[in-house]
């Protein structure tokens, strides 16, 4: 009988100087790091049914999904601190994901890479991580993502902001691994982030970076369409 294993992890992150919580779904398979939406918890993707939409892949041992919590409340959405500290907090979060999660699980694959995914602002996290670390990422699935962080920075601009703003740093990217990545920008004509996806698609196209701009029809920026997209996109992973 097939089953979907669920495990809870909590550890002290040296990069963030705080505790991090994470759910892991599956007993074996290709690693997928799945980010929550804005200020979301590690259990949000389970609560909203996104994990359930991928149950077949999980039960078959084809994928393992890693769901860390975000620190958006202390980075992009923390208006009580200066933008310098907001982006620094996010930079440390990126290091945590890279060194404490991805580097530990990517050796489970023959390619030494992982897939990353997320909905809404989780799509930003997935895209930004993938494009900053293309040597670690084989697939990037953004569903209803928005990719500019300028609105969070109150006019502040520095290197940390630049190198966490995909539409700004992609034009100068030279890591050949990004041309080998399976990139999907999932959106719809009713999506509030539709224009953001068109813009990022244009940025990628100008660098001749292969990608799929998947535009669904008459669907809102919400979980129902993301639960349709996610299992569809997972089918693109070469599991063996």
Language model regions located:
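Non-catalytic cap/lid and distal C-terminal segments of serine-dependent acyl enzymes
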Residues: 2-240
């Amino acid at each position: 009988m097939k089953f979907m294993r669920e495990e809870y992890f909590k550890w002290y992150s040296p990069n963030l100087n705080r505790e991090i919580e994470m759910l892991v779904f599956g007993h074996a398979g290709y690693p997928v790091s799945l980010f929550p939406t804005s200020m979301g918890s590690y259990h949000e993707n389970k609560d909203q049914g996104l994990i359930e939409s991928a149950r077949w892949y999980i039960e078959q041992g084809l994928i393992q999904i890693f769901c860390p919590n975000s620190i958006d409340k202390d980075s992009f959405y923390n208006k009580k601190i200066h933008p310098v500290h907001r982006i620094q907090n996010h930079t440390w979060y990126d290091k945590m994901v890279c060194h404490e999660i991805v580097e530990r699980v990517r050796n489970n694959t023959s390619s030494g890479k992982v897939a990353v995914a997320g909905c809404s602002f989780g799509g930003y996290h997935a895209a930004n991580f993938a494009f900053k670390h293309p040597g670690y990422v084989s697939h990037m699935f953004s569903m209803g993502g928005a990719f500019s962080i300028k609105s969070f920075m109150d006019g502040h601009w520095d290197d940390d902001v630049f190198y966490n703003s995909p539409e700004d740093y992609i034009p100068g990217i030279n890591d050949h691994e990004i041309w080998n990545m399976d990139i999907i920008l999932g959106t719809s004509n009713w999506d509030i982030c539709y224009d953001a996806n068109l813009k990022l698609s244009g940025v990628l196209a100008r660098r001749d970076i292969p990608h799929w701009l998947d535009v669904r029809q008459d669907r809102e920026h919400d979980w129902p369409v993301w639960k349709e997209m996610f299992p569809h996109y997972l089918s693109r992973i070469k599991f063996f």
